[in-house]
Amino acid sequence: MKITLPEYDKAQVLVVGDVMLDRYWHGPTARISPEAPVPVVKVEQIEERPGGAANVALNVAALGGKVNLIGLVGDDEAANVLVKNLKSVHVNTDFVSVPNFPTITKLRVLSRHQQLLRLDFEEGFEGIDSTDILEKMHASLTRQPSVVILSDYNKGSLADVQKMIQLAKKFNSVVLVDPKGSEFEKYRGATLLTPNLAEFEAVVGKCHSEKELVERGLALIKELDLDALLVTRSEHGMTLLREGQEPLHLPTQAQEVYDVTGAGDTVISVLASSLAAGSSFEQACTLANAAAGVVVGKIGTSTVNTIELANAVYSQQEIGFGVLSEEQLKLAVKLAQHRGEKVVMTNGCFDILHAGHVSYLNTAREQGNRLIVAVNSDQSVRNLKGQGRPVNPVDRRMAVLAGLGAVDWVIEFTEETPQRLIAEILPDLLVKGGDYLPEDIAGGKEVIANGGEVRVLQFEEGCSTSEIIKTIRNNS
């Protein structure tokens, strides 16, 4: 199965669930307290990170998706910290503030990357009326988020989870649930559940073989009227189950495991973002599995960005080639540059590909390790060359260019010049054929300002698209 990272900036996700604040106190330990047989930690660093459903939303935003977060908080300093931190990373918060209840906060004390103690500040929101959350959900769903995540830590925000599932389904949203506890009946009708193995076996019983896990998982799908079930299995990876389809077993991609805190949040957020951006279930689960392998190598609740995810998915393999969207190309370029590869970019109409074009593109590719060709849209060619051009529409021109061995990536631009696109991509080297001065080449100033270089290459004499068209017309 070929995996391509989707355009996460197109994903719209609504997260509803138990919001928390994770606090971390870091410091060295050099002695034992004279008051009790416990280590003394000299606190030198304090971190505050969104946790629980807030960490799920943070993970969606880290991939570039648009996310709205709904949950219960107290009227306190911890809630203000959460709102401020989430706003800074473009997470839209729509919290329900509950007087006389503290925002759920977990304080961890660490020394030399080892957790020594955790203190929980919470009363739990059990029994709180869900009307306000349901109203906020309805308002958010009218803005058409394509995927809804229900992040359940059994703290009370999802007390009426069945009503939430039915509300989301009225808007034809995909509903993903990260469950808690052994009462899975309340999640009936969701699109997909993501229990870990312990949670899954607490519901269906101990599974002694792969066959048993699959059979019981499929039975659970039927019983709860689900579309799919994704069982996360720690060092054994994860398994995607769907009725009438073969199970998909994905081995773990974790290289080192430092902390599993928040790994489940990362899985469901990448899964949701990928589905919202157009990935299939298989592709979305593969990406979520890769992301989990990255995040467990970090300390505490954390996120995975597109570069880390691309590295995990592609490793030392090719990121892919051919015709890409702008977001896909930006990711491909960042990953190539991250590996130390030199990215070259050029542009043109390339209406009827001829020997001069091929020679020029080969020379351009020799200047670096990767070659991008930006191609004028049909209207752009028409504006430059006049009526009757292009002879070949842009999809055919790009397909031919993508088939050349010298070319890695091809992209269309619709403006008169590719200046905006080049400024977004920022290749290491920008090349152009003809009698240009480097400072006059569109996008050149931006490339140079970024530390790149601009070069002018020579076209092969005697080759011209206009002359080819003239010859064809004269002979017809």
UniProtKB/Swiss-Prot annotation:
Keywords: ATP-binding, Carbohydrate metabolism, Kinase, Multifunctional enzyme, Nucleotide-binding, Nucleotidyltransferase, Transferase. It is an enzyme of class 2 (transferase). Transmembrane segments: none annotated. It catalyses: D-glycero-beta-D-manno-heptose 7-phosphate + ATP = D-glycero-beta-D-manno-heptose 1,7-bisphosphate + ADP + H(+); D-glycero-beta-D-manno-heptose 1-phosphate + ATP + H(+) = ADP-D-glycero-beta-D-manno-heptose + diphosphate. InterPro entries: Bifunc_HldE, Carboh/pur_kinase_PfkB_CS, Cyt_trans-like, PfkB_dom, RfaE_dom_I, RfaE_dom_II, Ribokinase-like, Rossmann-like_a/b/a_fold. It comes from the Bacteria. Pfam families: CTP_transf_like (PF01467), PfkB (PF00294). CDD domains: RfaE_like. The active site is at residue 265. ATP binds at residues 196-199. One of its GO terms (molecular function) is phosphotransferase activity, alcohol group as acceptor. HAMAP family: HldE. Homodimer. Catalyzes the ADP transfer from ATP to D-glycero-beta-D-manno-heptose 1-phosphate, yielding ADP-D-glycero-beta-D-manno-heptose. NCBIfam families: cyt_tran_rel, PRK11316.1, rfaE_dom_I, rfaE_dom_II. In the N-terminal section; belongs to the carbohydrate kinase PfkB family. This is Bifunctional protein HldE. It comes from Psychromonas ingrahamii (strain DSM 17664 / CCUG 51855 / 37).
